[in-house]
Design a protein with these regions (language model features):
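Eukaryotic partner-binding/assembly regions in large regulatory complexes
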Residues: 1-73
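Leucine-rich, amphipathic alpha-helical/linker segments
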Residues: 11-25, 91, 97, 101, ...
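Short acidic, hydrophobic short linear motifs in intrinsically disordered regions
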Residues: 21-30, 99-125
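Short amphipathic alpha-helical interaction segments
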Residues: 34-42, 125-143
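A short, conserved structural fragment
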Residues: 49-55, 138, 142-152
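Short basic alpha-helical hairpin corresponding to helix-turn-helix/winged-helix-like nucleic-acid-binding
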Residues: 55-110, 117
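Minor-groove-contacting beta-hairpin "wing" of winged helix-turn-helix DNA-binding domains
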Residues: 60-64, 153-158
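Short, amphipathic alpha-helical interaction segments positioned at domain boundaries
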Residues: 74-78, 159-181
């Protein structure tokens, strides 16, 4: 693949974001369009640099990683738990959980409710209030491109599907294991 660096006008910004674990999605207009238009060049360049650029058909790009650092594992667990609890909460309140995940603003009141109802789970992650959840999980999700801050709270973005996929895999493995017993 011939790579014309002059065409990759946002290479530095894209590399910095992806290298920090950020997921570039359609809301990241300029970077998203450039990746979309020059995907072959970016894939070849990042591959030569030792990165595995992934494009998810649900609308986002990211570097595949093994998430081997202990700290990233803790962050991922906190995000996964929050997503799982949100899905459960929306289902319990009679909403379509998948629609609500992406359509509802996650405000401080909701965060406080989630922490109170699931205190035993959040305590293990040292999250004791809605403010802790906001600071330790939601602001981290913004830094990773999984959510964006809006007036009154946060909106989840398409890259959250990576966590939903992982939760579904765990769920399927649990059922398979139970069936085999």
């Amino acid at each position: 693949t011939h790579i014309n660096l002059d065409e990759l006008t946002h290479l530095q910004a894209i590399n910095k974001k992806l290298g920090a674990g950020y997921h570039i999605c359609e809301q990241d207009n300029v970077m998203w369009q450039e990746l979309d238009q020059h995907i072959e060049s970016y894939s070849a360049l990042f591959s030569a640099l030792g990165h595995d650029l992934k494009h998810d058909s649900r609308g986002f790009y990211y570097f595949a990683s093994d998430e081997s650092t202990p700290n990233m594992g803790k962050i991922s667990r906190a995000i996964a738990l929050t997503i799982y609890i949100l899905i459960e909460h929306f289902a319990n309140t009679g909403k379509d959980p998948m629609r609500a995940l992406f359509d509802e603003v996650n405000d401080l009141e909701l965060m406080q409710t989630l922490v109170q109802i699931n205190k035993h789970l959040f305590d293990q992650l040292e999250i004791f209030s809605g403010s802790d959840l906001r600071k330790d999980v939601y602001l981290r999700m913004v830094r990773l491109g999984l959510a964006r801050e809006v007036e009154g709270g946060f909106m989840l973005q398409a890259p959250i599907h990576r966590y939903i996929d992982a939760l579904m895999e765990v769920n399927e493995e649990t059922y398979i294991t139970e069936d085999e017993q």
